[in-house]
Amino acid sequence: MKHYLIIGSGLIGRLTSWRLIQAGHAVTILSSDDKAGTDSAGFIAASMIAPFTEAVTADRSIRDLGIQSQALWDKWLPELDKPVFYPKTGTLVVAHEGDKAELARYQRRAAHILDADDYQKIDAKQLQNLSPELAENFQSALYFPEESCLDNRQFYQQVGEFLTKHTNWQTIEPIETLTNATLEQLCQQTLGHSLNKFTSVIDCRGNGSKADLKDLRGVRGEVLRVYAPEVNLQQCVRLMHPRYPLYLAPRPDHQYVIGATVIESEDRSPVSVRSAMELLSALYSIHRGFAEARVLEMRAHCRPALPDHLPTIRQQEWGYQINGLYRHGYLLGPVMVEQLLTKLSEQTDSGVRYAS
C-alpha cells in the first residue's frame, strides 16, 4: 500500500486525500487549519460549478476542463455518507436596462467561446416559466442549463468526517517552505518517523506555498451569506455590471451566497464598507425579497492565482505541488486532482526518490 503525505486541508487537500483513500492508499494530513477548514478559501466560496459562464470571461479550456470536473462531481458525491446539496438547475445571466450593453458584450463573447447548445437566450415568457421571481425585475436572460453549484459547508463537513476516520490528521504550525530537509524535520518532530516512509508528498497549501511558488499571488474575494425567507430563487444568477458583476448561489433553507469582488490584493482584513454596500445594493436589485434578508456572514479571503489564472501541477524532488486554482477551485479541483492521481499511479513502487 502506498502512503502519501498531504500538506494542507483546504479544498484541494481534502479532495486529494479523499480520492487517494478511495483508490486504496494510506494518507497522512498535516495542516495549520482546523479540521472544519474555516481558514480556507474553499470554506467561504460560492462553490459554483459553472464551466460555461466562467469560460466566457476566461477561455475555452475552462469550459472543457470544467465539464470533466462536473462529471467527476456527479460520480464522487454519491460516495459520501450523507447527501450534499447539489442542485443542477443551471445559471441565469441577467442585466438591468442600463447595463444591457454589458449583457450584449457577454453574449457576443459566449458565441465566440462556447458551443451553440451550451446556452440559450430566453425571453420574458420563458424566464417567467423558469424563474417567476427573477422575471419580476428582468425581461430576458441568457440561460446555461447544465451549470450547478454545491453546498461547500456540507461538503467540507462530510469529507472532513471521512478523513478524520481514515487518515492520520495532525494540526501543525504553518510551514513556510518545503524541502527534503524541512520535511524530514517535520516528520521526525510531528510523526516520529522519517520522510522516507511516504511514497510521495503532495503540497496543497494554496497561498501558503508562496515561498516555494514565486509566481503565486493572492487575489482577494469578498462574499456575503444571507438568509432570505421571502426569496425562492432556484438557479444560480449572474448580474452583469461594468464594475462589479455579481454572482448568487442558492443554498438550502433560503440561504444564498453572494460575491462579486476580484481585488488584486493579498489583504485578509474584513469586508470593506464600499464592497458591502455594492453587494447589498446589487442583491436588492435582483429581488425585493432580499430587503428583509438577514446577513449571516461577511467574509473575505485570498484565492491563490498564477499569472495565467490557470491551475498547475508541478513535480518537486519530494513530490508534487498542486496550486493556482484562482476562483475555480470547485470548477477545476476534481479534474486537477484526477490528473494528479494519474501522475502518482505512473510512479514506480519506490515513488519519488528523495535526494540525500
Predicted regions and their residues:
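N-terminal Rossmann-like FAD-binding beta1-loop-alpha1 element of flavoenzymes
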Residues: K2-T28
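Active-site substrate-recognition segment that forms the wall
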Residues: L15-A23, M48-I49, V84-Y86, S200, ...
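Dinucleotide-binding Rossmann-like beta1-alpha1 core, especially the glycine-rich loop
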Residues: A46-L130
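Helix-loop-beta segment of a Rossmann-like dinucleotide-binding subdomain
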Residues: K82-H96, R108, D118-E161, T261-S265, ...
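C-terminal catalytic lobe of FAD-dependent flavoproteins
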Residues: A293-S356
